[in-house]
Amino acid sequence: MSAIIEAKKQLVDEIAEVLSNSVSTVIVDYRGLTVAEVTDLRSQLREAGVEYKVYKNTMVRRAAEKAGIEGLDEFLTGPTAIATSSEDAVAAAKVISGFAKDHEALEIKSGVMEGNVITAEEVKTVGSLPSHDGLVSMLLSVLQAPVRNFAYAVKAIGEQKEESAE
């Protein structure tokens, strides 16, 4: 019996470490999905660099407590799978939200962003945001626009002066 308890403690430590190291976590109820659909979801998540695992609710509850995450208890009922991303804060929410639109059986329960519990609606909102790279490119284009417009204005003035000099 002691070996079983040690294995459970080790699993709780592993889950707590995953929760602590992830920048975003999405908790879903996968009930009603076929094996093919779950396999498809797993492959999409893997491509996005997101880890997807099914854990017992009691183990997740203890791990969340150990990781200092409060407020998850109410969402840990029924079959629960957890998608975590340690790199991109938007990746897990984006893939899960997109998959949930096409497959109504996948229910988003809640999520955790940087240690704070968020609702299913907030997960969907985060999922609709562009990725980090997309946001950076948007910012760069906004910063580049005034310089580009100034260059066009200088070029137009130069062309205008050339025409008047002729």
Curated annotation (Swiss-Prot):
Pfam family, one: Ribosomal_L10
Matches recorded under InterPro entries: Ribosomal_uL10 (IPR001790), Ribosomal_uL10-like_sf (IPR043141), Ribosomal_uL10_bac (IPR022973), Ribosomal_uL10_bac_type (IPR047865), Ribosomal_uL10_CS_bac (IPR002363)
Keyword Transcription included in the entry's annotation: no
GO annotation, cellular component aspect: large ribosomal subunit
GO molecular function (one): structural constituent of ribosome
Any one GO biological process: translation
Alphabetized UniProt keyword annotations: Ribonucleoprotein, Ribosomal protein, RNA-binding, rRNA-binding
UniProt keyword Ribonucleoprotein present: yes
Leader sequence segment: none
Highest taxon above the source species: Bacteria
Function recorded in the entry: Forms part of the ribosomal stalk, playing a central role in the interaction of the ribosome with GTP-bound translation factors.
Family: Belongs to the universal ribosomal protein uL10 family.
Subunit structure comment from the entry: Part of the ribosomal stalk of the 50S ribosomal subunit. The N-terminus interacts with L11 and the large rRNA to form the base of the stalk. The C-terminus forms an elongated spine to which L12 dimers bind in a sequential fashion forming a multimeric L10(L12)X complex.
Name the record gives this protein: Large ribosomal subunit protein uL10
Organism encoding this protein: Staphylococcus aureus (strain MSSA476)
